[in-house]
């Protein structure tokens, strides 16, 4: 099996010995042992509209003989991973695929393609994905006008930020980046309709790639917006409470603020009685809500690093009362960054970033000069 290269606008990219382009898949961005049989995300069981199989659209490059590196490919980078009793070729640990949309040698129709819950890219001799210059623009969605990228094929994919990220810093790596592919670029991203060019920046990720930022916030796509046949403007990742990523995911407004939509606060049973919680995203994960002892009525003292570990419960407009909660006790306060935070009996409400999957993981937690307590439906901190 010969793996060689050809020239492209991105640099030299990997191809088969017969000149067919080779691709990598963001869904494979998780640690695995190349010696063990594993179930890779792109399988014959992963079917899109019309029961189209992922491996039918993106056939794995199988190791049919000794691996031979040519044309600048690094021999040490070639390897295999076992899948369904056959060996798939890898390059620097990432499985390689072909694309059925490439009808002839030299075609690169799978580049920057969104399908089967991930992004597909050509692979460079360095082992990094071939990324062009990305573009940011606004897109109308069910939640209103939000930030999107038209760079993917088919285009206009909604972009998200993670509450646990610091300014110009990402905390979403490894398995997280498989579910939330970062928006990458080969240089400074371009500003499309409705986007301020001065707000666009980049950060260098741990693997050396450049991720786009907007107003200092790293931006991502969501794998479940990238399925085969998925339409532009999907916001399946909106208000998603993601325990694996330690934070809350939001779509991004044109001004760079997170867009939480309208938040509904409900009650749930606990060992401390009825306490407040929020159900977030399409996965309906429940998250306990907390109050902070230094706060006063409608005044939050949790800012900066505190607000990263204890994200404020945000809302767009007046929050709604769910089961067991009185609407008259809900309110809002305007934070220093312009976002609206939900209050209950005047108490500003927070999530605990490292326990965002229900339960009282952050109860009676001393931090940042105070103590965080769960909030009862009666407004007490317990």
What are these regions (language model features)?
Residues 1-382:
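Compact beta-sheet-dominated domain cores in extracellular/mature segments
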């Amino acid at each position: 099996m010969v793996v060689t290269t050809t020239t492209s606008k991105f640099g030299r990219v990997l191809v088969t010995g017969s000149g067919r382009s080779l691709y990598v898949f963001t869904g494979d961005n998780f640690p695995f042992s190349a010696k063990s049989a594993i179930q890779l995300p792109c399988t014959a069981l992963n079917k899109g509209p019309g029961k189209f199989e992922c491996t039918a659209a993106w056939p794995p490059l199988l190791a049919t003989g000794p691996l031979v590196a040519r044309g600048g490919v690094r021999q040490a980078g070639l390897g295999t991973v076992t899948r369904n009793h056959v060996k798939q070729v890898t390059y620097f640990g990432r499985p390689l695929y072909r694309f059925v949309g490439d009808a002839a040698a030299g075609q690169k129709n799978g580049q920057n393609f969104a399908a089967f819950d991930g992004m597909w890219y050509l692979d460079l001799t360095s082992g990094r994905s071939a990324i062009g210059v990305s573009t940011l623009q606004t897109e109308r969605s069910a939640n209103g006008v939000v930030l999107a990228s038209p760079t993917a094929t088919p285009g206009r994919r909604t972009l998200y930020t993670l509450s646990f990220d610091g300014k110009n810093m990402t905390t979403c790596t490894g398995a997280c980046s498989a579910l939330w592919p970062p928006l990458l670029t080969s240089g400074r991203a371009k500003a499309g309709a409705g986007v301020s060019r001065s707000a666009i920046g980049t950060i260098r990720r741990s693997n050396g790639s450049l991720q786009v930022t907007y107003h200092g916030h790293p931006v991502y796509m969501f794998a479940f917006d990238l399925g085969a046949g998925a339409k532009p403007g999907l916001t399946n990742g909106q208000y998603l409470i993601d325990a694996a990523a330690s934070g809350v995911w939001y779509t991004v407004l044109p001004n760079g603020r997170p867009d939480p939509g309208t938040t509904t606060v409900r009650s749930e049973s606990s060992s401390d009685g009825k306490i407040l919680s929020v159900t977030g995203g399409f996965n309906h994960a429940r998250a306990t809500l907390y109050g902070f002892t230094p706060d006063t009525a409608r005044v939050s003292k949790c800012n900066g690093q505190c607000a990263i570990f204890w994200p404020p419960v945000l809302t767009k407009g007046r929050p709604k009362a769910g089961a067991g909660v009185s609407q008259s006790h809900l309110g809002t306060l305007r934070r220093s960054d312009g976002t609206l935070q939900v209050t209950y009996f005047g108490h500003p409400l927070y999530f605990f970033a490292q326990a965002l999957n229900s339960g009282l993981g952050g109860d009676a937690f001393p931090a940042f000069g105070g103590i965080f307590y769960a909030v009862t439906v009666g407004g007490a901190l317990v």
